[in-house]
Amino acid sequence: NITGYYRLGDYDALSASLRYFSLGEVLTSMDADAMTIKPYEMAFDIAYSRMLSETFSAGVALRYIYSDLGYSDDDETTPGSAFAADIALYHNGYINIGGHESQLGWGLNISNIGSKISYDDGNTSEFIPTNMRFGLSLLYPIDEYNTITIAADANKLLVPTRPTMDQYIEHMIETEGGTAADYENNFSDYRTWLEGEGYFNVSPISGIFKSFGDAPNGFKEELQEIQ
């Protein structure tokens, strides 16, 4: 990682970073036709942050993502790229608890709001991991020399649920008959079914809103997605 920042004034700053991640050499399988791949990813960020008041600040970041799965001998697999943005808010104030001035802070970050990424020269596109995170913290002074801090955060992935292979198999049995064994290895047909279901046609912004109500098992599963 390479990072740096520049203060524009007393209340705002610019920052930039370059990240590179490599998995090294990876053997795709133990079969005779296995190949060795060298997947890697890199991202370049530029961000602006500003203190809007004594207790409130905000920041935005723009990001370029490049991802290469390393299948150099596979004409069907190409490197993917995407653009994304982050939005962050932070508030830090004071409240009175039992006669003690306590510090209460909260923060919200929505990251990777942006385009999809394709590894097959644009034929199909996948969602990048848009994520929302919200956190709270309370600092309470016990006495003149000691304080206690309580903090918690919640995380939610903002991408629509991808229809599973099991759903595809169930659909095929209902419409075409047969057994699960007839369809469980039909990955190309499964992908064609995904296209028919419109999964690849959902825009990134629509996917964010769709992610709040598309869990197969309803609201209970939506709550389980919050970590």
Q: Where in the sequence are the language-model features?
A:
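Subset of outer-membrane beta-barrel
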Residues: 1-227
